[in-house]
């Protein structure tokens, strides 16, 4: 039986399997097979909105909280809400990250719908919004328009998405690839650019690392993250949300008592310091 955290809950009844996030920390052998089921079964729903939703739930989102509720409206529409119990009051008090996650959800929904030839008319905050935080009002309403879109080449890469948690190579990205990314990033009325390996890149690496230090060294934000960690394959399979810690290194660390919620919350522990060292190396290897 699927747990609450294993499904996308549809308001009014029904569900679509939800997914363990690719954005969490994955070490060595990757996530549990059962938690990856929605990635393998995406696109198998027969009803077109549910089929699009089976891809949308794979969207990256903060701490992999999967903070969405969906109501199917009539035969050609749906309404997206935020599951307010899945916000991050310490880490994300103004719901900025949660809103970005909903944006990713809507973009994947549109890409998946376009694959089936449906356009999507998306209205953000149709009943208004509280500028300070999310509330019970809808985040978006979506109407599907038959024949209203052509498939987007980006859709082919949806299931290959991952969040890199390894050191970046010390080389520049090829100019052709950068140009392609800048073009894709400029298609929505914004300007995308790159900075290369310049002093600005060094400044951004430093800001990234110092921001991570601040979040980790603030007890409330660190504890919120620790509480959402799924340590080892059994925990990931039981609750395929949150921040997954898996792999051979994690398994050994858990066995010898180095990797557990107590040590990860203890700023004086070796496990806590190793986590900081790992993220510093990641941040400082990033390229512009």
Segments from the language model and where they lie:
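Acidic, surface-exposed loops and disordered segments
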Residues: 2-288
């Amino acid at each position: 039986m699927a747990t609450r955290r294993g499904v996308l809950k549809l308001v009014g009844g029904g569900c679509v399997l939800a997914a363990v996030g690719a954005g969490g920390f994955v070490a060595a052998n990757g996530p549990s097979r059962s938690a990856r089921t929605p990635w393998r079964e995406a696109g198998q729903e027969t009803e077109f909105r549910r089929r699009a939703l089976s891809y949308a739930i794979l969207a990256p989102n903060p701490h992999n909280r999967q903070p969405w509720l969906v109501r199917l409206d009539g035969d050609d529409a749906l309404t997206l809400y935020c599951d307010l119990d899945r916000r991050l009051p310490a880490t994300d008090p103004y719901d900025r990250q949660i809103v970005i996650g909903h944006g990713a959800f809507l973009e994947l929904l549109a890409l998946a719908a376009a694959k089936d030839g449906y356009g999507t008319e998306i209205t953000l905050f149709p009943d208004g919004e509280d500028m300070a935080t999310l509330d019970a009002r809808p985040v978006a309403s979506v109407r599907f328009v038959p024949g209203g879109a052509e498939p987007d080449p980006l859709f082919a890469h949806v299931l290959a998405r991952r969040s890199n948690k390894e050191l970046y190579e010390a080389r520049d990205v090829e100019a052709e690839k950068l140009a392609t990314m800048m073009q894709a990033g400029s298609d929505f009325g914004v300007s995308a650019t790159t900075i290369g390996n310049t002093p600005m890149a060094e400044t951004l690496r430093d800001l990234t690392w110092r921001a991570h230090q601040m979040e980790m060294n603030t007890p409330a934000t660190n504890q919120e993250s620790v509480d959402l960690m799924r340590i080892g394959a059994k925990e990931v399979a039981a609750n395929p949300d949150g921040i997954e810690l898996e792999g051979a290194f994690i398994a050994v660390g858990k066995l010898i008592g180095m990797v557990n919620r107590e040590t990860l919350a203890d700023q004086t522990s070796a496990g806590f310091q190793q986590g900081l060292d790992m993220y510093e190396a990641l941040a400082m290897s990033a390229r512009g």
